[in-house]
Amino acid sequence: MKYFIPLEAGKFYHVFNHAVGSEKLFRNDENYNYFLKKFNEYISPIASTFSYVLIPNHFHFLIEIKDRKELYESYRILELKKEFPKIKPETELDFEKFVMQQFSNFFNCYTKSFNKKHNRKGALFIDYLRRTLISDEEYLRNMVLYIHQNPIHHKMCNRLEDWKYSSYNSMLSQKPTQLEREEVINWFGDLENFIVMHTTKNIEYSSTSEL
């Protein structure tokens, strides 16, 4: 499976990565919360988020890259925040490079904070951001199940609702969220079927991802 394909405007992707060696990405609640805060800061301008899970040594997100018009507006807003902004015309902007730069800035920001907090040096994430294209609605549903079932697969908990750092509980809630909750529920028909499928359908991990 190709894990380093371009992140193109208007397409769905499963994005994921792992800590280097035996390191953990998250050692405490503060790390988890800071990661999500910075994800929202860096990635929400370029993508909509449909589901996620954070495990001590890796993470998974299901996202849709925004369309070119939205990406260009985000680029303009971010560029104008700089001391010396240099705004390219839309026809000259490399959209895929812009998207990847946001992920790179996000990982660098988190790594610097993590290293300072835990008195360590060097890389925290392996390789580059891994991603796979999600091509149809059945694949989208299966990816949501895969992501939410990940903590059970890794024996972090026995019930989906017991793992705090996934989007599963947010999907069941009525509280405001940055997630595309309504669209995700619609993929399953309704909330009842969403819950039933999460508890009755098991996804084959070897055929979906190595994490």
Could you say what each language-model-derived stretch is?
Residues 1-211:
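Short catalytic/metal-binding and nucleic-acid-binding patches
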